[in-house]
Amino acid sequence: MGLLSVDLLITLQILPGFFSNCLFLALYDSVVLVKHVLLQLNRSKSSHGQWRRMLTPEGLRCVWNSFLLDAYKQVKLGGDAPNSNVIHVTDKNSSSGKPGTPCHLLDFASSERPLVVNFGSATUPPFISQLPAFSKMVEEFSAVADFLLVYIDEAHPSDGWAAPGISSYEVKKHRNQEDRCAAANKLLEQYSLPPQCQVVADCMDNNTNAAYGVSFERVCIVQRQKIVYLGGKGPFFYNLQEVRQWLELTFGKKAESGQTGTEK
């Protein structure tokens, strides 16, 4: 099968999901518009904010590119985990490197323990909303598993496809590696993670994003350098509950550090 035929086949596979996402964005904009008009009619103070549409040319490009990333990703369930280039953001007293030091994703994987890798950015609402659940998971299972947060390209930068609603802070597009690491540090200032979770940033070539088909957010589990769990494409199929279920089935529900330590 020629390259053109492969690209055409992938495009045909992408189209249904792409159009369903566009329909969702159109419905979302319609609901927000009606709410905005009603608030204006009621002269509510909350109606004075700027109304941001989601179904925009920039939004369509981002959604389409997200499906392309997912379609062309290197990672496969049961396959080898890509050893992508990343940059240290936190040290956490680790001997593997200091903040700002280049490293590889699999540097954080041990020989036997599973490595839970959570990909996302501060401007991705589903990722942010599940950070507390992720932190709790780290605390409960850090005795039997390792955890890594990979900060990627912004999902909704303030100078790009900005998300509607009031955000605790805004982040612009990353112009260099310093911008990306600064955004990751800003996230950690507001959402403190347990010290057992390491934090790295994707390089500016977005090689990790491309290899794992992240785009907005994704989660996977690496064990013995193989992908033993591969979460769905975000935002609609980003599900930390499935990760918890995998850990519970593998290690049991009583995997907290204290309990595991006493049982040993």
From Swiss-Prot:
Entry EC number(s): 1.21.99.4
InterPro entries, per database record: Iodothyronine_deiodinase, Iodothyronine_deiodinase_AS, Thioredoxin-like_sf
Membrane topology, from the record: Single-pass type III membrane protein
Primary localisation category: endoplasmic reticulum
Catalytically driven reaction(s): 3,3',5-triiodo-L-thyronine + iodide + A + H(+) = L-thyroxine + AH2; 3,3'-diiodo-L-thyronine + iodide + A + H(+) = 3,3',5'-triiodo-L-thyronine + AH2; 3'-iodo-L-thyronine + iodide + A + H(+) = 3',5'-diiodo-L-thyronine + AH2; 3,3'-diiodothyronamine + iodide + A + H(+) = 3,3',5'-triiodothyronamine + AH2
Keywords: Endoplasmic reticulum, Membrane, Oxidoreductase, Selenocysteine, Thyroid hormones biosynthesis, Transmembrane, Transmembrane helix
Enzyme active site: 124
Pfam families (alphabetical): T4_deiodinase
Keyword Endoplasmic reticulum: yes
Record-level Gene Ontology MF annotations: thyroxine 5'-deiodinase activity
Chain segments annotated as transmembrane: 8-28
Coiled coil: none
GO process terms (BP): hormone biosynthetic process; thyroid hormone metabolic process
Function text: Plays a crucial role in the metabolism of thyroid hormones (TH) and has specific roles in TH activation and inactivation by deiodination. Catalyzes the deiodination of L-thyroxine (T4) to 3,5,3'-triiodothyronine (T3) and 3',5'-diiodothyronine (3',5'-T2) to 3'-monoiodothyronine (3'-T1) via outer-ring deiodination (ORD). Catalyzes the deiodination of 3,3',5'-triiodothyronine (rT3) to 3,3'-diiodothyronine (3,3'-T2) via ORD. Catalyzes the phenolic ring deiodinations of 3,3',5'-triiodothyronamine and 3',5'- diiodothyronamine.
UniProt protein name: Type II iodothyronine deiodinase
Species classification: Eukaryota, Metazoa, Chordata, Craniata, Vertebrata
